[in-house]
Design a protein with these regions (language model features):
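A short alpha-helix capping/helix-coil boundary motif
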Residues: 10-15, 71-73, 191
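Short, compositionally biased low-complexity segments
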Residues: 5-11, 31-38, 177-189
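Active-site nucleotide/adenylate-binding loops and adjacent lid/helix of ATP-dependent enzymes
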Residues: 18-19, 29-164, 204-209
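Alpha-helical membrane-targeting segments
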Residues: 1-18, 24
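A long amphipathic alpha-helix within ATP-dependent nucleotide-binding catalytic cores
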Residues: 153-228
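Short secondary-structure junctions and interdomain/linker hinges
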Residues: 5-8, 44, 68, 160, ...
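Active-site rim elements
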Residues: 20-24, 197-200
Length: 228
């Protein structure tokens, strides 16, 4: 509160990332961030307007070199809201017709390890600090050879069971083989059932140098990074 009075600005802290709307704390466009990063630092991405005819969307997707599955999500959004994995043209058309805002089509990166890093740097300093490093474990279920996916979900009592019922009704009655495992979500946050594991013991000078380089190139001074 004192800092707000002293600076005479409610959003005084937004200057920590001057290149982003509200400093990247709320309402920023993902495109804003990606435009400041080298292309090899994020998955292949295109942006779709909700006003585009679906035929144009199809053309953009194919000319962009995408193949199913891929990810769609709003350009402005958080907490995994309206994030979807698209496996077919029908799913893409359904998503497009229901989507009221600009969204992004993004390459599906299916690596087993996802980590989060929190980094900050004062603009006057050459080097910053990494204050958190953690891995994300997505919620999953393992088959027993006779229970359906729906029965396994009910046994697990996961917080996202209802969402899965709505999205994947056709698959809920299939039986998962013994030892076979499927992810219940591809979104790495607590709301969607992910768990987090501390890796701060792995922070070293080499990792810090990498993020110093990113910070100097992008002018991101206060940021969490999600990496696969």
């Amino acid at each position: 509160f004192w800092y707000m009075l002293r600076s005479r600005a409610v959003w005084f802290f937004s200057t920590s990332n001057p290149t982003l709307t509200f400093g990247g704390f709320e309402g920023e466009s993902k495109k804003e961030m990606y435009d400041l990063l080298p292309e090899n630092y994020f998955p292949k991405t295109i942006y779709i307007s909700p006003r585009q005819p679906f035929e144009q969307v199809q053309q953009n997707v194919y000319s962009g070199g995408f193949s199913y599955p891929f990810i769609v999500k709003p350009d402005v959004g958080m907490e995994g809201i309206l994030f979807r994995k698209i496996d077919s043209e029908y799913q893409l058309e359904t998503y497009h017709r229901r989507m009221p805002v600009e969204y992004m089509v993004q390459e599906f990166v299916d690596y087993p390890l996802e980590i989060g890093i929190f980094y900050y740097r004062h603009p006057q300093n050459a080097s910053g600090s990494i204050t958190a490093l953690f891995s994300k474990k997505l919620p999953s279920i393992s088959g027993d050879g006779f229970s359906t996916i729906k029965e396994l979900l009910e046994k697990e009592q996961t917080g996202i069971t209802e969402e899965l019922f709505k999205l994947d009704e056709g698959e809920l009655d299939s039986v998962l083989g013994r030892g076979d495992r499927i992810n219940l979500s591809f979104i790495g946050n607590r709301y969607h059932g992910a768990t987090f594991h501390d890796l701060s013991g792995q922070i070293d000078e080499r990792l810090l140098n990498r993020f110093d380089t990113i910070s100097h190139g992008s002018r991101f001074y206060y940021r969490r990074y999600d990496i696969k």
